[in-house]
Structures are given as C-alpha cells and as structure tokens.
C-alpha cells in the first residue's frame, strides 16, 4: 500500500499546482480515466489473494475518493476565479451616462381627442361609440336628411350597397343612444368618419367628435355658453367667438361657430344647433317635453388650428420629423 500512498500524494500535488480547469481535466483522465492509475489498481485486485481483495479494494476506493474530492474542490475554486475575472473585465461603469431611450408619443389627433373628451367628461358627458359601417337609416333617414340630399350622392359617400355605407358622420351614435337611453342624455362621441374627398384640407378618412345633450328646457343659451367655455379651454386663450346662422337637416336653429385668430381673420371651428323635433320623434322622444342641442367638430381641423399645421395630409404620412414635435 506504500505505492497507493505515493499515488495519492502525487495526485494531490498535481491538483494543487494546477492553474486552470483544462489542466484539471487532463489530470482527471490521467488518474481516473479508463486507463488511469486508479482504474489500473482496481483491475490489479485479481492478482492478489481472494481473502485480501475486500480490504485492499476498500483502501483503493478511499484513496480515490480523497483524490476525487480534492480535484472537485480545486475545479470549483478555479471556475470561480475565472468567472470573477470575466465579470471584472465585463463590468459596467454605472457612473457613465447611459444611452438615451427613444420614447414614443401620442399622435397629435389622439392628443386632441383626449383633450376634448376630458373637457366634456368633467362636465358629466359620457363617451359613446358606434359602428363605422352604418345603415342609411342611422346615417341619413333618422337624422332628417331627405333622400334627395346631396350628401347621399356617390361622389360624397362610400356606399357598399343601396343601404350600407361608411358613416359620413358620428351622428348615428346619437340616434342609437337616444333609442336605448331615456333623457336626460349627455354624450360625447369621437370616431372615424369617411367622405369621398382628398386635397390639402380634406382626406377620405378623418376624425369627428359630436356632442348630444337632451333634457327638459335645454336651450340655445346653454349651448352658446358651453361652446364658449370649451373653445377658451381648448385653445388656452380668451378668443372672440361668433355664431353664424346656418342650416343642418338635423338641427333647428343651426349655427356655425367661428373664432378670431391672431391674424385678425375669422375661422370656422365647428357646427351646432338645437336638435330638430323630427329627429326626436324618430327616436320616440316627445319634442313637446324634451329639447336638446348637438355639436359637431372635425378633430383634424381643431388640431391644425391649435398647432398651426397647414396641410391636413401631414397627419397621415407618419413622418417622424413631424410627429416628434408633439411629444
């Protein structure tokens, strides 16, 4: 067994002097592999008397276990050292300025919708939505728009067939709401609408927001006050506002609203009026008991006026140089 003691001493010395994991792998093969020293010792047990084999085999296994434990401990220590060295080389100096994260932002049209909805929501109006593919009843008939009205023509409206179309206004939301809700009613209805038009100030798809207020004794004075307050809050300045008599089939009386800009010119911003009695009758509301007013505004137009944008098409071109200005 003197040879076994020398072998263990040799293994331990080789392990202690190893400087990397690769050297340990070589030692593992040399001492513990299929042709390694410990394997040969176990194979040599057949050459000794049978009665001595258990004791000798036990000593060989004990010696092998000592050497194996030493190798495992050394390997773990070297791996930890290598890992620490690698981490030290790859460490990040947290005092250095980092890379600036690119943040997204809301589209200017979305910003305007949020501003308008927030203003009226604070006054008790609830948001209402409706389908963009609409029937001619909700888009025209129920709104007191006669069959010969030019808005029904193909050059103004996208028709699917004789009765279905892409809505040209969000007014259908008002009809659907009045059919299912008892007065008093206060809704704000934002959404996409479609008209067959495309130039510097018109696009085939644009956004519209409509208001509807139905209650007993609703009147034009309330409507004017509401619009004054809204325009002052939206443009964040004390604007001159004027109401011009106009005509809409679904309101009577009707008006278009202009604001005085800094260049001294009047600019139209929205349309409004008292809900026509025929519209109330179409949804089963008694116009002798209830009255109401409606407001309609183009979101892109409001956005253009607020941010001094001259070409409506810029909102749909997805040019980041343009969109980044609204963050």
Swiss-Prot record:
It is found in: Cytoplasm. Pfam families: Phe_tRNA-synt_N, tRNA-synt_2d. GO terms for molecular function: ATP binding; magnesium ion binding; phenylalanine-tRNA ligase activity; tRNA binding. Mg(2+) binds at residue 252. The keyword Aminoacyl-tRNA synthetase applies. Disulfide bonds: none annotated. Binds 2 magnesium ions per tetramer. It catalyses: tRNA(Phe) + L-phenylalanine + ATP = L-phenylalanyl-tRNA(Phe) + AMP + diphosphate + H(+). Tetramer of two alpha and two beta subunits. Belongs to the class-II aminoacyl-tRNA synthetase family. Phe-tRNA synthetase alpha subunit type 1 subfamily. This is Phenylalanine--tRNA ligase alpha subunit. It comes from Haemophilus ducreyi (strain 35000HP / ATCC 700724). The lineage of its organism: Bacteria, Pseudomonadati, Pseudomonadota, Gammaproteobacteria, Pasteurellales.
């Amino acid at each position: 067994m003197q040879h076994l003691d020398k072998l263990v001493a040799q293994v331990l010395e080789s392990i202690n002097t190893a400087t990397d994991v690769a050297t340990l792998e070589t030692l593992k093969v040399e001492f513990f592999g299929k042709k390694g020293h410990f394997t040969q010792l176990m194979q040599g047990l057949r050459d000794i008397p049978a009665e001595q084999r258990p004791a000798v085999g036990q000593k060989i296994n004990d010696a092998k276990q000592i050497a194996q434990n030493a190798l495992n401990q050394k390997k773990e220590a070297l791996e930890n050292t290598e890992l620490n060295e690698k981490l030290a080389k790859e460490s990040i100096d947290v005092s250095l300025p980092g890379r600036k994260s690119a943040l997204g932002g809301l589209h200017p049209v979305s910003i305007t919708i949020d501003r308008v909805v927030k203003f009226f929501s604070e006054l008790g109006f609830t948001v209402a939505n409706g389908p963009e593919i609409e029937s001619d009843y909700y888009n025209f008939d129920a709104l007191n728009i006669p069959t010969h009205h030019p808005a029904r023509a193909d050059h103004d409206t996208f028709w699917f067939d004789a009765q279905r179309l892409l809505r040209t206004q969000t007014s259908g939301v008002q009809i659907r709401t009045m059919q299912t809700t008892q007065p008093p009613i206060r809704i704000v209805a934002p959404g996409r609408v479609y008209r067959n038009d495309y130039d510097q100030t018109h696009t085939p798809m644009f956004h519209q927001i409509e208001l509807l207020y139905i209650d007993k004794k609703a009147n034009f004075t309330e409507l004017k006050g509401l619009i004054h307050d809204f325009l002052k809050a939206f443009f964040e300045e004390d604007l001159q506002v004027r109401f011009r008599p106009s005509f809409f089939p679904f309101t009577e009386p009707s008006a278009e609203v202009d604001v005085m800009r800094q260049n001294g010119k009047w600019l139209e911003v929205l349309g409004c009026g008292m809900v026509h009695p025929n519209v109330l009758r179409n949804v089963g509301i008694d116009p002798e008991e209830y009255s109401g007013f409606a407001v309609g505004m183009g979101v892109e137009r409001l956005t253009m006026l607020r941010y001094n944008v001259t070409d409506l098409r810029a909102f749909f071109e997805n040019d980041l140089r343009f969109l980044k200005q609204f963050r």
